[in-house]
Amino acid sequence: MAIILVIDDQEPIRALLRTVLEGDSHRVLEASNGHHGLELYQERSPDLIITDIAMPEMNGLEMMVELTRRFLNVKVIAMSGGLESEGALKVAKLLGARQTFQKPFDMGHLLSAVRYDLAN
């Protein structure tokens, strides 16, 4: 059982991801912005982070910069929706995201990515 940190400012997205990931026997931590996500990562050292890009206070890209500055080998899957998502996801890849998903996405594909990233 892996610990997965889900970071998204939209509670319905977090709830959906929690349901899917817990159904696959993972423990899920939740944060609504990058600041809280960084705090949880430091306190709990999850095995994987799934983060949205566009969030208030500290967005996913800013959080990824901080994560890579402070910690080694952080596994991140980035997701984004909206008009700027394609460019933001390219930047996320450059910052070290292992996988990227444009919202809306297929939960089966995300779950496959989670399993792959946890195994490698």
Q: Where are each of the predicted segments found?
A:
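Active-site residues of response regulator receiver
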Residues: D8, D52
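Alpha4 helix (beta4-alpha4-beta5 surface) of REC/receiver domains from two-component response regulators
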Residues: E62, L83-F101, S112
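Two-component/phosphorelay signaling modules centered on CheY-like receiver
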Residues: E11-L29, L95
